[in-house]
Amino acid sequence: KENLTKLINNEINPMSREDISVLEFRDVIKTVNSAYEDVKLCSQTILELHGYLHRYSHIRGGRYRNEEINIVNSEHYQFFDYQSKVDLEANIEKNIKKDIENICQKYYELMNEDEIQDLIIIASFIIDFILILPFKEDNIKMAKILTLLLLNKSNYEVGRFTSLGEFFDNEKQLYFKNLFSKRGDFEKESYNMNKWLEYFLS
């Protein structure tokens, strides 16, 4: 932990790919904290943030995945079932972009209606984003970044007081994976959202 703090503060040089990943994540968090008022939530912004998250990496960032993935359907949001290999790669990427655009649009619609508490709207957006799994790598990191962005936009400037690395700590990540790992869990829409809101707001 001491070395992590020194790395973040540029007191030591990165020695591994993991160290570089920490610096990439730190830089994106700094950008979001300083420029959130001018950042629009949209597909293009999400791609740019993902690209920035991998700017020193051999992993190509800033592009939605174009490979199939096993995921179950949920009544909470209309997700695709990629268990078959019918979709072409281009269609997969196109469909993901459409999904992301849809949840971004829904976020703004709900915020403008001003009938639901901001934190619930943000939590709903984040769970939709995670379940879409738009990228090959670092979907959870992107969820942290988008959480910070949206909380800042709603004047919950948590990034000034804590690192959102703690938001998805190891124990909670395991809990989350277990919660949404079975088809039966997806079929219980209200159960899922209640559990997610409890997890998100705790």
Cite the ranges covered by each PLM segment.
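FIC/Doc superfamily catalytic core
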Residues: K1-S202
